[in-house]
């Protein structure tokens, strides 16, 4: 059932286990949906434009999110120039966003990241507390009642000082205004592996967790910076480490650490309960982020019954209409983000990968080898045709963002077809002296060279189509 916008959680109304008007209760949360759930504009790179933010607010309402967290890393007044007031034109834009959020029943949460140069102690610390309160006061007058102060991605690890700063700002803000809602933070050690060693809190996390008031909601990113899935057991360990229920800043579909690949899959399986808040960090390409964000909304509304694959298929159908089948074939090859420290998102092209593995294990005379060959050929052709249609029919703004990946999909599909033909030609060497086999091998090598030349700008289906083509090229 899609009319989730009529099911609004009664946050700020004193509901046990939810985000209360006076702060955040830290009792275990058993309710479904997740009480505070939404999108955090928290990526590095070019921030969203006003039109994109207005669009995402409407999207939040339609999909059942109830919060948008403003925290663009490359907004200078959010981070480097955090003490300075916003220029009038930017302040007008923020005011328009706050007004639009209220119209959409979406909570606008305003965040500042002062950690690069904030003073936490002494007179300078007092001055910076007043600077932060002044910054928040301007936004409060625009209608903002929910705030955040983040200390992520900085070198200094003064846990006690940060906790004191947060406590003072939260307390003074609430004393000034009785209608302040949530007050959130992200610590400097913001994922589980960095918070502890052998299950024992590291000094920073120990000081921060011990000193922080329980009316400040802590967000963390899970087991790693970008590592999925996240189990209930893993969340329970993090909660126990902090002695409170932690909220989740989930780094998918954000791809600012590997922009050559788009995150077009569903959100990984996540905990089924005891989560007070969740925010999904998107890509800088707002429109293409919506597939994953819609699945995140499905999870946040009903964690117990979230089905990633089903949610993903339904999101694509809703968003792409007559192009849904084509988009699903393309997006299937662009779901998982993986490097030496990140591993998040479901596997790329699982059907293609499984069929390719079966084919190479059994070719040429094993059971089902010929059927696998025919199936893989059909899959390659379908992906080429789908990418071709999308190149012609996608909306211009989306096409601009994913053209390199679509073109790489066409290259990979063509190379897959050549690889399949090469497998057949290898069985006919006795008949033609290997002429066709040599010709196809040369063609495949040229196609692989073209694929490699474009990997610096576009990655897709690396461990499915890409792996199959390379495996066949090495095969003798």
Q: What is the role of each PLM region?
A:
Residues 37-218:
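Aromatic-lined carbohydrate-binding surfaces of glycoside hydrolases
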Residues 2-8, 14, 19, 23-74, ...:
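Mature N-terminal, pre-catalytic/accessory segment of carbohydrate-active enzymes
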Residues 87, 122, 159, 228, ...:
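Hydrophobic alpha-helical scaffolding
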Residues 49, 87, 230-231, 368:
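A diffuse structural propensity rather than consistent per-protein peaks
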Residues 42-43, 154-313:
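Catalytic-core regions of glycoside hydrolase
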Residues 304-476:
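C-terminal functional modules
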Residues 139, 149, 296, 413-416:
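Conserved short hydrophobic patches within well-ordered secondary structure
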């Amino acid at each position: 059932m899609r009319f989730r916008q009529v099911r609004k959680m009664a946050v700020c109304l004193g509901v046990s286990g939810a985000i209360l008007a006076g702060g955040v209760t830290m009792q275990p949360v058993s309710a479904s949906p997740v009480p505070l759930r939404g999108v955090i504009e928290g990526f590095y790179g070019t921030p969203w434009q006003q039109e994109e933010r207005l669009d995402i607010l409407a999207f939040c309402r339609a999909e059942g999110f109830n919060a948008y967290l403003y925290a663009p890393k490359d907004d200078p007044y959010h981070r480097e120039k955090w003490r300075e007031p916003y220029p009038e034109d930017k302040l007008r834009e923020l005011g328009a966003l706050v007004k639009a959020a209220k119209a959409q029943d979406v909570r606008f949460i305003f965040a500042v990241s002062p950690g690069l140069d904030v003073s936490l102690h002494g007179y300078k610390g007092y001055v910076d507390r007043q600077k932060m309160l002044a910054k928040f006061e301007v936004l409060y007058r625009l209608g903002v009642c929910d705030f955040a102060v983040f200390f992520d991605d900085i070198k200094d690890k003064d846990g006690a000082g940060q906790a004191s700063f947060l406590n003072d700002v939260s307390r003074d803000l609430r004393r000034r205004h009785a209608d302040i809602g949530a007050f959130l933070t992200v610590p400097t050690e913001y994922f589980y592996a960095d918070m502890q060693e052998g299950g024992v809190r590291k000094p920073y996390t120990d000081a921060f967790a011990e000193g922080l008031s329980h009316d400040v909601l802590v967000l963390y990113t899970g087991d790693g910076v970008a590592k999925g899935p996240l189990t209930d057991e893993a969340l329970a360990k993090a909660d126990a480490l902090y002695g409170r229920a932690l909220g989740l800043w989930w780094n998918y579909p954000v791809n600012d650490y590997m922009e050559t690949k788009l995150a077009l899959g569903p959100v990984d399986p996540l905990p089924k309960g005891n989560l007070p808040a969740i925010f999904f960090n998107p890509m800088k390409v707002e429109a293409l982020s919506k597939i994953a964000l819609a699945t995140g909304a499905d999870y946040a509304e009903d964690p117990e019954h979230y089905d990633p694959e089903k949610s993903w298929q339904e999101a694509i159908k809703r968003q792409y209409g007559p192009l849904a089948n084509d988009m699903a074939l393309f997006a299937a090859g662009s779901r998982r983000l993986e490097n030496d420290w990140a591993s998040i998102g479901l596997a790329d092209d699982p059907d293609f990968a499984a069929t390719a593995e079966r084919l190479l294990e059994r070719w040429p005379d094993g059971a089902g080898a010929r059927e696998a060959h025919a199936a893989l050929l059909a899959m390659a052709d379908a992906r080429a045709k789908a990418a071709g249609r999308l190149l012609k029919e996608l909306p211009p703004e989306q096409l601009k963002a994913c053209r390199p990946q679509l073109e790489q999909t066409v290259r990979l599909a063509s190379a897959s077809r050549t690889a399949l033909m090469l497998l057949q030609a290898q069985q006919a060497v006795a008949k033609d002296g290997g002429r066709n086999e040599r010709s196809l091998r040369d063609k495949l090598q040229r196609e692989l060279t073209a694929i490699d030349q474009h990997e610096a700008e576009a990655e897709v289906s690396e461990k499915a189509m890409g792996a199959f083509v390379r495996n066949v090229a090495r095969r003798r």
